[in-house]
A protein has these predicted regions:
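Active-site-adjacent "gating/activation" loops or surface patches in catalytic cores
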Residues: 94, 98-106, 356-398, 409
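Conserved S-adenosyl-L-methionine
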Residues: 117-121, 125, 150, 394-436
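Non-catalytic substrate-recognition/targeting regions of SAM-dependent transferases
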Residues: 44, 49, 318-380
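Conserved Class I SAM-dependent methyltransferase catalytic core
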Residues: 118-171
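DnaQ-like (DEDDh/DEDDy) 3′-5′ exonuclease domain used for proofreading
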Residues: 1-94, 105-117, 126, 285, ...
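Glycine-rich adenosyl-nucleotide cofactor-binding module
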Residues: 60-84, 378-410, 416
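Flexible, glycine-/basic-rich loop-and-beta segments that form/coincide
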Residues: 177-247
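Conserved proline-anchored active-site loop of SAM-dependent methyltransferases
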Residues: 91-106, 157, 411-426
Length: 436
């Protein structure tokens, strides 16, 4: 990616404080990395951090020594701050999330309209290059942007972090498109933002937790109905019947699989159950029987194949007990149920739902790289901090932090803004560094 000023350091921080007043504007905003090397070295040399204060449960007090286990917030030019603390934190940060200026008409990049994009790219390049040095080998950086600069930012980050370390471009639904016709005939209304995700080392990086979308169960079922999509979880096993031991086979590792048949089982459709027992209240029927509602699948597995070959029973319902060697039930005795002569595997509704503290049942679904379930409405009021523009939902930051870090890991955000990243990191028992 080539652009004017690429081989320079942008001297100012490009905030409104730097650009709005003549006496704060640098004489020469760009320093060439070859011609002005000495001046750049002086500019980026470590600075003395002053006015240090510690905030804890005992209030605020001045300190003269910093404990690395403490969280850190620095107020000042973020480029200079990063170079100042680099020696202490290089290779120690598990996650970097930033939400930089989007380089729109509302931002402060006004040096030269002709080179507006180049100025922004120089600004980002200077910061991303030093940010990479902070990441641990298994760390990741996520940068949020809109479609204005996303294509250019992607190529820039490919250059800095390596194309092989690109993981995802996550699309986030940030607002409702609405019914206004203001864009009609020219373009579609933009209601998405994007998060570019890169690892430090692709071989060392692993996603921590697969992000999940959540929706109240009955709302989800109603949505499918409106879209003409059938909902599969409609069978309820009300009685597991009499369980009889049939024998034992071995899995591929030689571990035992115990086989059973079930006689006198009772299965009913959820709609019939709602009519018979709940006066037609379908929600009540689902909520009361969530652990007994199922669908079946013919998904292939080595265990199912062994069961189909060995099971000599004409019972409609059969089951096995075994101990998985991998997966979420690793090392635990696990029961699988099968239906019919083809031994279709039971899949339980309870495995894709969970109950909240207030009694709601939410349906879970892998979010993938389309995050359209996060509410941006009234986000400016979250945390009792009013921030009219650019504030991100706490649920977004929670998802990102869960995705790429563990407890006690360090999370860095050098475009703090409303400090949502720091607030969520603290709630999730992560250490944080913030620069604003």
């Amino acid at each position: 990616l080539d652009f004017p000023y690429k081989d320079t350091i942008l001297k100012a921080s490009m905030s409104k404080e730097d650009t709005d007043e003549d006496d704060l504007r640098p004489d020469e905003p760009f320093l060439n990395e070859v011609i002005a090397k000495e001046e750049i070295d002086v500019l980026l040399d470590k600075k003395i951090l002053v006015n240090a204060k510690k905030y804890d449960e005992n209030g605020v007090r001045e300190i003269d020594r910093f404990d690395e286990n403490d969280n850190l917030i620095i107020k000042g030019n973020n480029l200079l701050a990063l170079h100042t603390i680099k020696e202490r934190y290089a290779g120690k940060v598990k996650l970097i999330y930033i939400d930089p200026p989007y380089n729109t008409g509302n931002d402060s990049f006004k040096y030269n309209d002709k080179f507006n994009r180049s100025t922004w790219l120089t600004f980002m390049k200077n910061r991303l290059e030093i940010a990479r040095e902070f990441l641990s080998k298994d760390g990741a950086i996520l940068v949020q942007c809109d479609d204005n600069e996303q294509p250019y930012l992607k190529v820039l980050m490919d250059e800095i972090f390596g194309e092989e370390n690109f993981k995802n471009m996550i699309t986030v639904k940030a607002k409702v498109a609405g019914v206004s016709g203001s864009h009609q005939g020219r373009s579609l209304q933009n209601n998405c933002e994007y998060i570019l995700m890169y690892s430090k080392d692709s071989e060392e990086f692993f996603i921590n937790i697969t992000p999940q979308k959540e929706q109240e169960l009955m709302q989800y079922i109603e949505k499918l109905k409106e879209e003409g999509i059938s909902w599969k979880y409609v069978q309820v096993i009300t009685d597991f019947g009499e369980r009889k031991y049939l024998g034992e086979i071995k899995d591929g590792s030689g571990n035992p699989i115990k086989m059973y048949e079930h006689r006198n089982t009772e299965i009913i459709n959820i709609n019939e159950l709602a009519k018979e027992k709940y006066n037609g209240d379908l929600k009540k029927a689902y909520y009361d029987n969530i652990d007994r509602i199922f669908d079946t699948t013919n998904a292939q597995s080595s265990i199912r194949k062994r069961v189909m070959e060995a099971m000599k029973s004409n019972a409609d319902i059969t089951s096995i007990d075994y101990v998985p060697t991998t997966g979420r039930n690793k090392g635990k005795v696990t029961t699988l149920f099968y239906k019919g002569p083809k031994r279709r595997l039971f899949t339980w509704l309870s495995d894709i739902t969970y109950k909240t503290s207030d009694g709601k049942i939410l349906r879970k679904e892998n979010a993938g790289n389309l995050w359209d379930d996060l509410q941006y409405n009234n986000v400016n009021k979250e945390g009792n901090i009013s921030f009219s523009n650019g504030k991100k939902p706490e649920k977004l930051l929670k998802r990102i932090i869960e995705l790429c870090s563990d407890e006690n890991d360090i999370v860095l955000d050098f475009f703090m803004g409303s400090a949502t990243t720091q607030a969520v990191a603290m709630k999730m028992n992560r250490r944080f560094i913030g620069v604003e």
